[in-house]
């Protein structure tokens, strides 16, 4: 296709709290699966006392299967200095019961005048300002196959690779 259907980008938030923290995002059509997740990958300590280990992650699952997962390295019981990844999971439907569907929530918010679910005009205008700059300087398209996670060169964007998402995660 000659139409842009995939984007992978590295972003930064320009304030003191998030200074120096890279934010990576990718989205596209006909990828391996549809997943709405935000993954926070914590820095590893300067020294790994228990050998090579996975990074600790905090995962927010959005959409049909809302929840929060924390994946962390925990020392195994006993005298040996061994760790393994342990996952702690909260399934929102289990904890809080089933909720309204997305369209039902949106229509209800519009009816009762709840502005929380709607984008403010200043955010829309700022988004268009960014998009206009991108459209003025088109970039080379990188094709990818349907059912993959995007073009190969998108993998190089994230130094240690993209965090596993969706069915890639052992739950």
PLM regions with names:
Residues 1-171:
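Secretory/organelle targeting and membrane-embedding segments
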């Amino acid at each position: 296709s000659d139409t842009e259907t995939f984007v992978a980008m590295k972003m930064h938030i320009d304030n003191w709290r998030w200074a120096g923290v890279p934010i990576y995002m990718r989205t596209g059509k006909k990828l391996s699966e549809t997943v709405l997740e935000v993954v926070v990958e914590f820095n590893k300590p300067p020294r790994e006392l228990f050998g090579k280990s996975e990074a600790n992650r905090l995962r927010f699952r959005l959409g049909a299967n809302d929840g929060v997962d924390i994946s962390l390295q925990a020392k195994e019981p006993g005298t040996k200095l061994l760790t393994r990844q342990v996952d702690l999971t909260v399934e929102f439907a289990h904890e809080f019961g089933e909720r309204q569907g997305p369209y039902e929530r949106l229509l209800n918010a519009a009816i009762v005048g709840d502005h929380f679910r709607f984008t403010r005009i200043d955010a829309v205008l700022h988004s268009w300002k960014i998009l206009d700059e991108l459209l003025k300087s088109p970039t080379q398209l990188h094709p990818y196959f349907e059912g993959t996670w995007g073009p190969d060169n998108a993998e190089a964007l994230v130094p240690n690779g993209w965090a596993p998402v969706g069915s890639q995660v052992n739950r």
